[in-house]
Regions:
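Alpha-helical transmembrane segments of compact multi-pass small-molecule transporters, enriched
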Residues: 89, 145-146
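Short runs within selected transmembrane alpha-helices of multi-pass transporters and secretion channels
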Residues: 34-38, 108-127, 133-142, 149, ...
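Small-residue-rich hydrophobic transmembrane alpha-helices
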Residues: 19-77, 81-83, 115-134
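N-terminal membrane-sensor/transducer module of prokaryotic signaling receptors
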Residues: 6, 132-134, 152, 159
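Helix-terminus/linker motif at the lipid-water interface of multi-pass membrane proteins
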Residues: 1-23, 47, 85-95, 156
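Short alpha-helical transmembrane segments in multi-pass integral membrane proteins
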Residues: 45-110, 153-194
């Protein structure tokens, strides 16, 4: 989509594609930190759930949720405040590249501060033996929201639509995660687990 719709803008397909690739490399650093957090809490949740220590499971989830929010906020601020500096690490002599890097980071990462919470929630469901909910959350962002939204929004709004699809997908995935976790903890309350 960057190549196709980038060619229709003043930036051209080369700048759009290379800038998007650069952004994805930086994005992977933040993503890896959140995957590490999610994977680290999974055995704690699993063992405590198996031992019927439901309060510990909820506390672990709460801490993971808070830390994922803090990590996400940290990277969100970097993406919003320093996109030009990040871009200069890769290409320093192109004003068009710098300009598109700002647009790319600030649009694509617009709601990155909520990015980590669905990952932690998916890991939580996997740990407590609810793989269908974990799978639903894992597939939500990419398969159910991001790909269809990218195709629909880019056909309507071009390059900007392709970039705006990610924050919309992240927001929808966050909403799904919150609905599932609130329902889960309410179920625990009615069963007397917590």
């Amino acid at each position: 989509l960057m190549r196709i719709y980038g060619a229709t803008t003043i930036y051209g397909s080369d700048i759009a594609l290379s800038c998007y690739g650069m952004m994805m490399k930086i994005y992977q650093i933040a993503h890896s930190m959140l995957v590490g957090l999610s994977s680290g809490t999974q055995p704690i949740n699993g063992f405590n759930y198996g031992a019927k220590q439901y309060d510990r499971v909820k506390t672990t989830y709460r801490y993971a949720f808070i830390f994922s929010f803090l990590i996400s906020i940290f990277w969100f601020l970097i993406y919003m405040i320093f996109p030009s500096y990040i871009a200069k690490l890769f290409v320093s002599n192109s004003p068009m590249y710098q300009e598109f890097a700002k647009l790319c980071f600030r649009t694509y990462m617009m709601v990155f501060f909520i990015y980590g919470m669905p990952m932690v929630t998916s890991s939580f469901f996997q740990a407590i033996g609810k793989p269908s909910k974990a799978l639903l959350l894992s597939l939500s962002r990419q398969a159910f929201f991001l790909i269809p939204l990218s195709l629909i929004l880019s056909s309507q709004f071009g390059l900007k639509g392709a970039l705006i699809a990610a924050p919309v997908a992240d927001t929808l995935t966050f909403i799904v995660a919150m609905i599932l976790i609130i329902y889960e903890f309410r179920t625990w309350k009615t069963k007397g687990f917590i």
